[in-house]
């Protein structure tokens, strides 16, 4: 089976455990393993590309369009560094068991030792992923992630002339981030932070809060000037179901919006009978 680019050396007609295909994709960047996985999941690589683009749309990757599963050059196949960072973040948060593969330095398949191309795994113990890449049109690329003292950062470098430049730039970005940024829990989830008047309800008010903790990674100096602006819907009437969105909270620093989160009802309020 001839396949352009990196390969895991899969033999045609031979059954391969799914975990070996995943390791071949993650560690070796094996295009043969990638296509095999795509065909197993969706029947054809083209069908899997449709799945990829659907997920990209769901994640808000507005500057991404896939044409193949391997990342090989195609004039209509593109993404951005921001979208890659978002994709990496979702991978880490939503598939933690799968993400453990990304820090493995090597594996052996078909009696061939295959080594992870991410040199940062050897240079920095806090680095646990994510993925290298190279094509003649994109240059040398690396999405890297590291975690120190409970704070995780993701770095994306693309278009480097050499692989060493990619690793050097990625390490510098991570060091800069850990030195000058901080991750802080600003508000607790499922905890009352505001109340709102309720019309025609068995209770005349409803507690409001966040669905989950509000955690932000920002420059250290920014934390000193954080303020909250609560925007609660007007004329809230019963019935109200628990979890109903009834407003938003804006997080600002020196008047600049950092993020917004929905304010939800923490309890239900039934309609008052007559």
Map each language-model feature to its residues.
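Active-site-adjacent loops and short helices of periplasmic peptidoglycan-processing enzymes
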Residues: 1-85, 89-94
